Amino acid sequence: MLFKEKIPGLILCFIIAIPSWLLGLYLPLIGAPVFAILIGIIVGSFYQNRQLFNKGIAFTSKYILQTAVVLLGFGLNLMQVMKVGISSLPIIIMTISISLIIAYVLQKLFKLDKTIATLIGVGSSICGGSAIAATAPVINAKDDEVAQAISVIFLFNILAALIFPTLGNFIGLSDHGFALFAGTAVNDTSSVTATATAWDAINHSNTLGGATIVKLTRTLAIIPITIVLSIYHMKQTQKEQSVSVTKIFPKFVLYFILASLLTTIVASLGFSLRIFEPLKVLSKFFIVMAMGAIGINTNVSKLIKTGGKSILLGAACWLGIIIVSLTMQAILGTW
């Protein structure tokens, strides 16, 4: 496939990403990826000459998305995460476990598509859209499945930002306790920021930094989760063939790890991590571009038809994470 054949589709996704990005800055609680999916769905309903754009759209939804995940690694200082986030590790492990268990059980009960259930379970438990972006290519998720999972995650991000500060005060969480709660029970990084900022405004505190570090610690779970899912998916789809390490280990996850290691080395040498800021911004913009591509290819009728069960699954994962996060805090004495 010649690169010039991809240019029209890339340009279309770029054009969709620009207003989506601006709307995301104006309404961060909703976020640019959600706007990109919505605009992409509208564009996909009307645009003609699909043959001209399809190759670039496919390239964006797969390879630009994987590049975004790699660039995400430049925001992770592993030493800082291990130093500050290690205390939250038991809570993180338990919340991730309960979300994945709930997703597995309810997928069977609701007879929901396995791919959608996996994306919602991973997105709820790790880091929202970024986790979905990392998982989707590993399990060969379709664009409308990714769009549905992102939409479900977005709904509960909004609810968390609106409800959690009041809930935290009602049950008597300390500032440290709320930072752990927001960092482990809110899906997306931007929503963690919004939730912690709302708490700080009400209580005149400074929980944002702590909540963000806990959230970054959760992000590292992308690595083992994608590898395990890759092994499982490969064994399911290639039962007759041998499964090698080179086949099951997603290359973009390796590059994500290398980017994180480079960030850690640069930080340990005393350099400011602001030099990576453009790459972090580019990562977010690439995710928006990819969500635009996914929106274009989304089957709206299927999205509406299966949306109810997906929302119920997302609600169950979300409530399970809330209960486990608060229960673990009570047990560990971090309330």
UniProtKB/Swiss-Prot annotation:
Record family assignment: Belongs to the UPF0324 family.
Entry membrane topology: Multi-pass membrane protein
Organism annotation: Streptococcus agalactiae serotype V (strain ATCC BAA-611 / 2603 V/R)
Identification of the protein by name: UPF0324 membrane protein SAG1125
Any Gene Ontology CC annotation: plasma membrane
Transmembrane stretches, start-end: 20-42, 57-79, 84-106, 116-138, 151-173, 210-232, 253-275, 285-304, 311-333
Keywords noted in UniProt: Cell membrane, Membrane, Transmembrane, Transmembrane helix
Subcellular location: Cell membrane
Location (main, coarse): membrane
